[in-house]
């Protein structure tokens, strides 16, 4: 963890050199690959989350990842599930937060996310502890970026309906 000149150091700080190295690797992924980045803190403010973001250099990192085509930025820290677009320019990555397996209640039951995808969309299902087992709590369907294959599938689906 880097040094921060603020009293609440739990808000996090982003190292832009690490960000650029990760973005370079992700930008060179095969065409059509689902690009997922995992980090502890949500990079930008997620409306509806129980805690504020305020990650130092988080907005800049989000823009870098968005520009290199990252589909999902998977995070924790706030301990509640969410899936929200991070729209910058004409592209959108999604910020996807997971719960925690801790039994200490934080506004959502203990839980985790299940992620499934195809060429058109990513489906994120938040599973929560019911007291005896994990069960689906909420599901988000997130459209993938427009790759040529995804565009063709969307066009074919709209013609047939």
Whereabouts are the PLM-identified features?
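Short acidic, glycine-rich surface-loop motifs adjacent to enzyme active sites
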Residues: 30-46
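Residues that cap or initiate secondary-structure elements
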Residues: 25-28, 43, 121, 130
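Divalent metal-coordination and catalytic microenvironments
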Residues: 22, 37-40, 77, 115
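Short, catalytically relevant binding-site loops at active-site mouths
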Residues: 1-2, 41-45, 79-81
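Active-site-proximal beta-strand elements of phosphoester/diester hydrolases
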Residues: 1-4, 36-38, 93-100
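A short C-terminal boundary segment appended to hydrolase-like catalytic domains
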Residues: 117-161
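Conserved beta-sheet core of the metallophosphoesterase superfamily
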Residues: 47-125
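Binuclear metal-dependent hydrolase catalytic cores centered on His/Asp/Glu-rich metal-binding motifs
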Residues: 1-32, 54-59
């Amino acid at each position: 963890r880097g040094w921060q000149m603020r009293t609440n150091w739990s808000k996090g700080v982003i190292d832009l050199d690490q960000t650029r190295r990760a973005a370079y690797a992700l930008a060179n992924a095969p065409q059509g690959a689902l690009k997922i980045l995992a980090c502890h803190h949500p990079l930008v403010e997620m409306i509806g989350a129980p805690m504020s973001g305020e990650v130092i250099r988080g907005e800049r990192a989000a823009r870098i990842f968005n520009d290199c085509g990252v589909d999902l930025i998977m995070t924790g820290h706030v301990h509640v599930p969410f899936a929200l677009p991070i729209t910058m320019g004409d592209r959108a990555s999604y910020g996807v937060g997971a719960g925690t397996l801790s039994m200490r209640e934080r506004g959502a039951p203990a839980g985790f996310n299940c992620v499934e995808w195809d060429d058109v969309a990513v489906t994120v299902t938040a599973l929560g502890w019911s007291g005896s087992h994990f069960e689906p709590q909420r599901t988000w369907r997130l459209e993938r970026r427009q790759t040529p294959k995804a565009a063709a599938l969307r066009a074919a689906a709209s013609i047939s309906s």
